[in-house]
Amino acid sequence: MAPEPAKPATNSEVGFSYELGVDIEITEGNWQSVRFAKAIAPNAEAKTQDGQTYDDIGADHPIKVGESWTLTLEIQHQRLTDGKYLPEVEAFKAATEPDALGNKATVHVRWYDKPATGKANPDDAYEGFGTVSITRSQTGTNDIGGWNITVTGQGPRKKIKNPLNAAG
């Protein structure tokens, strides 16, 4: 007799790719949600040093000494009646202008669990400062345009309280 299929965990629900929120700090303390976003992909990669000793009997022994992080996303092209883009896109773009050097080329972002229904995970939220690169996406002859944005971390990301839980 074949074994019974595994039953889903009780009181749990499947998570979806769209259940992640991103904000950019437009001015100090003024966070703007990034709207019309997709393909949001935060990444943190350990920076290691070799800690191998004879006790490891030839095996690797990487020791985490820090991390590098990036946040990539795509924002659908939206234009306001005055011709400008959404405020969050304007903030990302401003950090990539030719005269944006040093702190002018730095943005403050946060990303966090944002479920479609139910409570947000209070422990799945981060923020950091980073340098921005931006390119156009969806550039076909009849595509809905967009922006591919990559924020490359300057220093470590910081664990924060999920802003959705703080608000509610």
PLM features: residue spans?
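Short, cysteine-centered beta-strand-loop-beta hairpins and adjacent loop/turn segments enriched
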Residues: 78-84, 157-161
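Short, acidic/charged, Gly/Pro-enriched secondary-structure junctions
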Residues: 85-125
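Protruding loop/beta-arch "assembly-hinge" segments enriched in small, turn-prone residues
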Residues: 1-11, 144-168
